[in-house]
From Swiss-Prot:
Name listed for the protein in its UniProt record: Probable endonuclease 4
InterPro entries recorded: AP_endonuc_2 (IPR001719), AP_endonuc_F2_Zn_BS (IPR018246), Xyl_isomerase-like_sf (IPR036237), Xyl_isomerase-like_TIM-brl (IPR013022)
Gene transcribed to yield this protein: nfo
GO term, biological process aspect, one: base-excision repair
Residues the record lists as binding Zn(2+) 2: E145, D179, H216, E261
Amino acid sequence: MKYVGAHVSAVGGVENAPVNAHEIGAKAFALFTRNQRQWKSQPLKADSIHLFKERCEAYGYDPGCILPHDSYLINLGNPDAEGLQKSRDAFLDEMTRCEQLGLKMLNFHPGSHLGKMEVDTCLSRIAESINITLAQTSGVCAVIENTAGQGSNLGYTFEQIAYIINEVEDKSRVGVCLDTAHTLAAGYDIKTPEGFAETFRHFDEVVGFSYLRGMHLNDSKKELGSRVDRHESIGKGLMGLDTFRMIMVDPRFDNMPLILETPDEALWPEEIQLLYKQLKS
């Protein structure tokens, strides 16, 4: 079964996210469990936690179809000691919040070397940050999102993601989320049937489908290999609808959250329906 949804607002409290997801016809959703633009946030309130769980159950959202995203400020590979510690503290808080909410995954961008360290050194630092956090928590999988490779951001090749996973001690608690726009921008052709087949053959060989926990479904404003991260509404970018049809009919992407992060939120109900229509085409 395909679980399509979007990254919905949790303004006013995390308990509002499942309501917002239900209202757009989503079968999955993503959210921020705290303010993504601040280093520190107020702890989750007991009534918010209770309502979140109650509403998820009422609307049929199993933890396996909810993919929370961490703060954009966090850089688990930060070459600066102070910045690294702030990132690790914030990541631990994010992971703890997921635990409190009964969630099973936390999606994050791996990190950036900021032009101050070697790539492999930064990748090892990211893995070390994950290990430190997993040792202090339980039950939540650290889900690495591939990036477009913009600036000094790492995690844009499958080899870099595999490098991090290889150094994570608890393999049962690390996974991957593939963003379609990032994948294209990083140089993987997923627009044509041939390119799509080769990209995911390569992913399976280097990383392994056993690690895939979810996807972000975004069309792209930028071309193949641009290394620029710019999302577009489904079917309105350079990717075209064929990519998303191939994902929707491929059983390898069943039973995981498929999350829209497209720029026009007003189109989300329409985009969700459009994606489900691909199953019948």
